[in-house]
Amino acid sequence: MVNDESSLLYWCHKNNVPIFVPGITDGSFGSQVWMYWQEHRNLHMDLFQDEQDLMDMVFDAKESGAIMIGGGISKHHTIWWNQFRGGLDHAVYLTTAEEYDGSLSGARVREAVSWGKVKAAADYMTVEGDATITLPIIVSAVLERMDSE
């Protein structure tokens, strides 16, 4: 049960906002989930249903937008399904990755525009900086703006 009001998970649960973690079985977190599962076999994850749910949300949306924190699998997962609906309408990348090495993590929004993963007419921006600093500043500014409207 999620009952900590200072938790993002709490508020997502309370407001029926889904959270998708495409790489949940990857790395140290995945091994921790696996170890937990050894003693709690009633834990089930349906990654294919997650894919279906995410795809349904993307295709059913009148507009699609995303804040992508970091790069790699979570960023790619978000932009991937959106290319099949003509691209994201709104996109914000928060990244510390460099562009010069050709990695997906370092690719700027204009690269996703060139592939149709973000619409050319979309509102988009890349914010270069540590997300533990930039995300709270962005959230604070959005909340302040919402309060004034």
Report each predicted region and the residues it spans.
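Internal active-site segments that recognize and position negatively charged phosphoryl groups
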Residues: 1-58, 64
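General beta-strand structural signal in soluble alpha/beta enzymes
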Residues: 19-23, 69, 93
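Gly/Ser/Thr-rich loops at beta-strand to alpha-helix junctions
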Residues: 25-27, 70-76
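A short linear-motif detector with a strong N-terminal bias
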Residues: 45-48, 69-73
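C-terminal functional extensions of proteins
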Residues: 63, 73-149
